[in-house]
From Swiss-Prot:
Pfam families in alphabetical order: Trm112p
UniProt record similarity statement: Belongs to the UPF0434 family.
One cellular component (GO) term of this entry: cytosol
Domain of life of the native organism: Bacteria
HAMAP family per the UniProt record, alphabetical: UPF0434 (MF_01187)
UniProt protein name: UPF0434 protein BCAN_B0909
Gene3D superfamilies (alphabetical): 2.20.25.10
Matches recorded under PANTHER family: PROTEIN PREY, MITOCHONDRIAL, ZGC:162634
Entry-linked InterPro entries: Trm112-like
Length: 64
């Protein structure tokens, strides 16, 4: 069984361990935008080359 999420090649086991660096809350993977989303912080962290960039300065603010 393949433990990779199709888009972005994110390891599912890694996603289960990662939390938002600001809130320590859970993250959701948005495959369409290749981002990890923290609903609590209202931020989306980019995933580049399969590597999550967990820096608040690199995150996109969610204005929705």
């Amino acid at each position: 069984m393949d433990d990779k999420v199709e888009t972005g090649n994110i390891d599912v086991r890694l996603l289960e361990l990662l939390v938002c660096p600001l809130t320590k809350g859970p993250l959701e993977y948005d495959a369409e935008r290749s981002e990890l989303v923290s609903r609590k912080a209202r931020l989306a962290y980019p995933v580049r080359g399969g590597i999550p960039i967990m820096l608040p300065s690199e995150a996109r603010s969610l204005t929705e």
